[in-house]
């Protein structure tokens, strides 16, 4: 009976997977939409925005919250983020994200939100960027303003910046700020006051929903 159930599930899911792939080939999805699960690449380094069940220290101004890093490889599921509406608001899946929208980025594996605050980052001593909340529920420190370089809508592969709504700092990575043990080779993600090359990001791998 269990074998029959498994066969039925495979018969249902496999065609759906291939249907989605063929749909993308016939009708490329060019716009970034709410509900999509994406990887974000730091433009200067090509590192992916990443989180994991490793916490910052609480001494020296750290928060003790789940850490966020830049990861050098593109094949880790801990680099997947789901695009959601701002804290306290729901946005329909498939709605196009526009320049100036306030969004949350929910870490797919741990269900915590990309977050920032006035706690101090461990290496560069700028604003710490962490993951916070439970099952996608956090606070206004999870809100980020989308700033596209051109156009009114966030397009796949386009350079984009994320400005933290509460602190007005920009999500950034600095290649020289590299961690040692227990996460060697990964780089610090922090909130920087200046809009510069280190604050540029773009979408890469992921599951993208067509616009509605």
Curated annotation (Swiss-Prot):
Pfam family, one: MIR
Occurrences of domain MIR (ranges): 29-86, 94-149, 151-206
Residues that carry a glycan: 20
Lineage of the species this protein comes from: Eukaryota, Amoebozoa, Evosea, Eumycetozoa, Dictyostelia
Domain of life: Eukaryota
Localization in the cell: Secreted
Signal sequence region: 1-19
Keywords associated with the record: Glycoprotein, Repeat, Secreted, Signal
Species: Dictyostelium discoideum (Social amoeba)
Name recorded for this polypeptide: Stromal cell-derived factor 2-like protein
Gene Ontology CC entries for this record: extracellular region
């Amino acid at each position: 009976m269990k074998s029959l159930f498994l066969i039925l599930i495979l018969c249902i899911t496999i065609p759906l997977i291939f249907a989605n792939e063929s749909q993308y080939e016939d009708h490329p999805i060019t716009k970034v939409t709410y509900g999509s699960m994406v990887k974000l690449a730091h433009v200067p380094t090509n590192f992916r925005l990443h989180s994991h069940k490793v916490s910052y220290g609480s001494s020296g101004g750290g928060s003790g919250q789940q850490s966020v890093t830049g990861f050098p490889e593109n094949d880790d599921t801990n680099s997947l983020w789901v695009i959601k509406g701002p804290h306290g608001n729901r946005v329909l899946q498939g709605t196009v994200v526009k320049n100036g929208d306030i969004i949350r980025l929910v870490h797919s594996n741990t269900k915590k939100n990309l977050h920032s605050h006035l706690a101090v980052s461990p290496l560069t001593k700028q604003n710490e960027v962490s993951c916070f909340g439970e099952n996608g529920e956090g606070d206004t420190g999870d809100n980020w303003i989308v700033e596209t370089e051109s156009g009114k809508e966030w397009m796949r592969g386009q350079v984009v910046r994320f400005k933290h709504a509460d602190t007005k700092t920009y999500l950034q990575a600095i290649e020289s700020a590299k961690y040692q043990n227990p996460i060697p080779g990964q780089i610090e993600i922090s909130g920087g006051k200046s809009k510069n090359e280190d604050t540029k990001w773009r979408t890469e791998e992921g599951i993208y929903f067509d616009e509605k």
